[in-house]
């Protein structure tokens, strides 16, 4: 039997319906943040079905990656970009967690998650983290962690401040400079572990390349990558 609170909630919803953070349309009562239409229609990559997918190929000859997967394809001016804009710039960390939940659930059926021991997010610069208040990649990782029951080490990697200008540097020098911008906080935590490093959007993969190689050099057994989205080149 419906209570007064139920009727009040329905009345408030009619007056002030929530908007989907992807398409901007009205979301139904009971839906969270993203409407069911967007959830169904988002451009999925299905990279978990193809180990030699386009994201994995970005790292060929650059970093030894066990698996490289992304949930969605990123397209400028598309609904995925709109959703990620809210995640990164509009104080909506719940978007990252929700997407992590969805992706984690979709990968449960083939036991893909059993390949990993620890989830580590790509870190933000400390100043950016203080300004934003959260790491969007860690929000995504939190969503995966809750579904897969795998721990996330939010500070497993840290961004430090002593990188120098990339101007006039060779590609190798730029790479070494970028890698010097990260540290492994506790090498014992990752030693002989199968690490899943998570990111929001992958473009060139340069940042991930530096993080992957640093983790391997610090004792990780394997390193894999999972991202919310990847750009199509």
Write out the residue ranges for each language-model feature.
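Glycine-rich phosphate/pyrophosphate-handling loop used in enzymes and phosphotransfer proteins
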Residues: 1-199, 203-233
